[in-house]
Amino acid sequence: MSRGYADRNVRRYQAYTGIGHQAALQQMKDKAPGSRPISTAQGAQRQLEGLVFEHLKGDVAYFAHPLGIASVLPGPGASTVTLDDSMTRHGHPLVAHAIEGLLPAEVPESVRTEGSEHIGVSGIRVARLSRRALHLTLVGTSASVVLRSAGDTDWAALVGERHSDLSGAGYRPCWNEPTLAEQEREFRTDHADYWRATEDASWLPSGLLRRVGLLHEVSSAYCTRYWATWDDWKFELNHDQDVLPAHDALVEHLIDPKWGMELRVDKRHCQCDAVWVDPHYDRECRIELAGPQGRPGTLQLRFRSLGTWRDSSSTHADLLRVQADHRWLHRVMPRHQSPSLSKARGRRRGRPDRSAAQ
């Protein structure tokens, strides 16, 4: 393999996963000849990754990376997900928000309503816990998702605080139980169709999680949100004024036969070049993707472009506050970039000021 080809593969691995150059270089060196660059999770591993991704949503807030995920290191039997060291819009640490959404606990009788009820994700368990990482698994399996933080997060302390808070309020944390708790079993029985549908379609969120870096490295959206209804996933990608959605590039990466997923474009509606669109108002392009015929799971991508009636300066300030990368900000929100700052950076890098040359 030529040096140039190997370097391109390393850069591409970085774009898909968001990990650093040295880590990407090592991952590509360790790949067996002929294997897929990004391995596909199977069985319980795939299901765990799907559940984690579905419930990791970092609230409606702005983070240094889309969805608050800085990087993912995917492996055949385990994945490591690094979260941003950021706060939600309520001033709550993102890592604490993730713990609350993922770790299950039984609800006390005093606050239960009709039907099965518990908080967190049924069946998720803590396999190992340290100051630096939270190792998750599914009950009765060897599946593994390791959560880390880009900051100095004490995972053990946060999980301990969560356990104390819940216990003090009458809840029963069950993330250390070797089997399903009663309320978890009730939930799976009462919602068997839903549980089966999400499990059958878990290939989709698992594959997206393993390629989450594309939302930062390829997409031109400054904000990305998502939600799932059974096996139907929807992503909303918001773009600033005068920034063209990179929907073609993003989809090409997602369906790439070597690096992407088993997805195909099912429907496409684009308003980028529509002459009748009033720039004062928002516009939206939609692309729907599906898996092989008969395979459950659909993905709808909504690329929203803001109209001139919106002022995104406060959003830009929020992204600066959470320490979003300045080069990324310049790409996704260029109109908020300070001209003097751009010139200074160009001089520091030894590049001429292009605006002066024009």
Residue ranges and their predicted role:
Residues 4-12, 16-358:
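Compositionally biased accessory segments in Actinobacterial proteins
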